[in-house]
């Protein structure tokens, strides 16, 4: 048969239902072969949108989504969506045409080395040089796309090869299974957990891919170990479950992050470093880590598991639960405050009537409007951070967030993939006005396919996440503003329904009506992104328990009792510094003490001091370092990281406090005398 026919037959054998793409001249033979195929070709308005549709289809079904483009510009347009699927671990097959092999050795119209271009962003890429190799290449591509960790594969078919003849038949797909976990490693993990004071489970996207949520919940219930999840691990445990600590990954001082900070052992299950870097929660590796995943742990300076259990996640969780038995390792009161704090935050602003609408109010209304099995897709922008923290799920794959490659423009085409995957579920995509416009053209695709869905645009006429990051780091913003079209008229021009929110109380009714409609509905909702920095400042506050932990870890206060530390902590101020700011200017009394909770500092002595330069790690005490200088009153401390969170104890306030608390004053003086003796000797 003709090579292009064989190519399509092989795709059919793999169970392909859809190909999403844009036809071109160099893949014309494939397009002709599809006329007699059971595969439905979905014409898209941009190859990037086609790749995002395939990305979400693969993530939700577990079967590779297939996208297609021609050579040259068609292939380059696919790149962003393909890279997104690869880094978010979604199985995807990217197909591209190519010029005839007779012209690829020289300069030629639209011809380029597409295989080399795809190589950094896929698991495997190849060109078909002989028609007889088509069955093997297709089978290998689908196998690699699906085996752990899943991702993207690229196949190129030159136009002359597509016309060749072949007598070869398609290969029959063969399934593969994950290996059983090692019993010895399971026993080691159980021993570590039994000896832990406060273990916490960190669940990632791998739990969802393995369909291991029931086993994870069972382990948590039998041992009492609480579960926090990453952005892409939402739904690994129901938000309503009393052992759920919700989502981690927004800021280092977030409530859930503090729970992990308190943990002495972290049981990472299906956790992916690409999503939430371990240096954010295990800097310097103070915690013991047990890793359960489909593959061996990635090598990282902050992530070196004491026990690494690669293989079948479901089987590993079952074996670990059986090994531990019904032995409660964590009492609920150990983490109840973290859960209750988050629940209280979820209840804030749910009835707020301010306009533009606060993010918290929007997500509260969205959560009430959607059922437990409905699907929310988040684009990338400031709204993604709010969704990650505030939108709660009862089941897996009901909130899809691009959090590996983090590409804007993901949600609108992704909603098409979600609706094609699960036609009976309601689908809502949340986009910023920046991300929405990046793939707005595929709004026509959704309308043409008659796929009921809702696109909720959070409008602020800015790149909101960039503003958030700039203001957090520099205290100001630069070049983030733009103008929007009339989104209602734009939606109507595409054949969709357009709605505009003009008050907060209007939103619930509009959402309910839109989700019940049999059409594509676009909702323009102005958002109050002043809440971004308010949240950052609030999460930057250092809680009392953390203050006390840092004081305990500082040599200067190591001899003080708990009561003394609590008094000292209560007199400490909290500040946040930029790298350009002096924490302690020249001439200020060196008895002012600094405890750096986040970031580093550098101490410079005055001209007549002994210290030239000293680096301070988080938790170090400036007052202790200044004692080493001949003229400590002239010491200067400079923050070494933007936004360094610092505890400051003013010397004068400290002295007054000690006069009122003479017992504590004597205790601290003894500690200082002992420390000075050590320094002198």
Which residues make up each language-model segment?
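Active-site diphosphate/adenylate-binding microenvironment
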Residues: 7, 30-31, 35, 340-413, ...
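Glycine/charged-rich beta-loop-alpha catalytic/anionic-binding loops adjacent to active sites
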Residues: 35-41, 60-66, 390-404, 472-474, ...
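Phosphate/pyrophosphate-binding active-site segments
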Residues: 132, 285-380, 384, 490, ...
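Thiamine diphosphate
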Residues: 95, 103-110, 299-302, 308-310, ...
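Cyclic-nucleotide recognition modules
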Residues: 564, 611-670, 677
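Regulatory nucleotide-sensing modules
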Residues: 548, 552-612, 616
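A general structural motif
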Residues: 46, 106-107, 176-190, 248-252, ...
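N-terminal alpha/beta PP-like core and its mobile active-site loop of ThDP/TPP-dependent enzymes
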Residues: 1-330, 365, 369-375, 453-455, ...
């Amino acid at each position: 048969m003709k090579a292009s026919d064989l190519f399509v037959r092989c795709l059919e054998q793999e169970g392909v239902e859809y190909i999403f793409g844009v036809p071109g001249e160099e893949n014309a033979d494939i397009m002709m072969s599809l006329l007699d195929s059971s595969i439905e070709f979905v014409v898209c308005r941009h190859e990037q949108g086609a790749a995002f549709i395939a990305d979400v289809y693969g993530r939700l079904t577990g079967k590779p989504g297939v996208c297609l483009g021609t050579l040259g510009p068609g292939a380059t347009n696919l790149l962003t969506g393909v890279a997104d699927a690869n880094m978010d671990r979604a199985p995807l097959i990217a197909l591209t045409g190519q010029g005839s092999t007779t012209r690829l050795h020289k300069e030629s119209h639209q011809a380029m080395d597409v295989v080399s271009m795809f190589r950094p962003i896929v698991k495997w890429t190849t060109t078909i040089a002989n028609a007889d190799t088509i069955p093997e290449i297709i089978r290998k591509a689908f196998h690699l796309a699906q085996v752990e960790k899943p991702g993207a594969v690229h196949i190129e078919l030159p136009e002359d090869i597509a016309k060749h003849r072949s007598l070869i038949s398609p290969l029959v797909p063969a399934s593969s299974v994950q290996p059983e976990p090692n019993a010895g490693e399971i026993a080691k993990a159980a021993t570590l957990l039994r000896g832990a004071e406060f273990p916490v489970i960190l669940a990632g996207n791998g739990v969802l891919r393995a369909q291991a949520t029931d086993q994870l919940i069972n382990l948590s219930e039998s041992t009492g170990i609480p579960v926090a999840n990453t952005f892409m691990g939402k739904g690994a445990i129901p938000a309503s479950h009393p052992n759920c600590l919700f989502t981690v990954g927004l800021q280092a001082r977030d409530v859930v992050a503090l729970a992990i900070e308190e943990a002495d052992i972290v049981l990472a299950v299906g956790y992916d470093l690409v999503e939430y870097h371990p240096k954010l929660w295990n800097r310097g590796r103070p915690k013991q880590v047990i890793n359960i995943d489909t593959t061996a742990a990635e090598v990282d300076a902050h992530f070196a598991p004491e026990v690494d259990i690669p293989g079948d996640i479901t089987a590993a969780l079952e074996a670990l639960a059986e090994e531990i038995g019904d032995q409660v390792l964590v009492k609920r009161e150990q983490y109840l405050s973290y859960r209750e704090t988050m629940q209280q935050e979820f209840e804030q602003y749910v009835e707020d009537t301010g306009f533009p609408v606060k993010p918290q109010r929007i997500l509260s209304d969205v959560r009430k409007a959607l059922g437990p099995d409905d699907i929310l897709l988040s684009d990338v922008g400031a709204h993604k951070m709010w969704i990650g923290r505030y939108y709660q799920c009862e089941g897996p794959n009901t909130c899809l967030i691009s959090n590996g490659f983090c590409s804007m423009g993901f949600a609108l085409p992704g909603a098409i993939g979600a609706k094609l995957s699960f036609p009976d579920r309601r689908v809502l995509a949340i986009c910023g006005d920046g991300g929405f416009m990046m793939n707005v053209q595929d709004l026509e695709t959704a309308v043409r396919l008659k796929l009921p869905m809702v696109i909720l645009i959070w409008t602020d006429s800015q790149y909101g996440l960039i503003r958030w990051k700039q203001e957090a780091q520099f205290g100001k913003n630069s070049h983030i503003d733009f103008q929007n079209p009339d989104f209602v008229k734009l939606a109507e021009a595409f054949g969709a329904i357009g709605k505009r929110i003009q008050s907060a109380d209007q939103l619930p009714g509009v959402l309910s009506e839109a989700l019940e409609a049999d059409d594509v509905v676009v909702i323009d909702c102005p958002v109050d992104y002043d809440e971004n920095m308010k949240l950052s400042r609030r999460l930057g506050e250092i809680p009392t328990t953390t203050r006390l932990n840092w004081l305990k870890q500082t040599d200067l206060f190591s001899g003080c009792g708990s009561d003394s530390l609590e008094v000292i902590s209560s007199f400490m101020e909290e500040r946040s510094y930029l790298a350009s700011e002096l924490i302690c200017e020249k001439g200020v009394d060196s008895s002012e003490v600094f405890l750096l909770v986040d970031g580093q500092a550098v101490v410079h002595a005055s001209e007549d001091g002994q210290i030239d330069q000293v680096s301070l790690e988080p938790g170090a005490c400036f007052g202790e370092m200044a004692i080493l200088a001949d003229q400590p009153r002239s010491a200067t401390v400079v923050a070494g990281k933007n936004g360094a969170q610092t505890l400051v104890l003013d010397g004068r306030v400290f002295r007054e406090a000690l006069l009122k608390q003479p017992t504590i004053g004597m205790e601290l003086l003894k500690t200082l005398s002992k420390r000075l003796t050590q320094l002198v000797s």
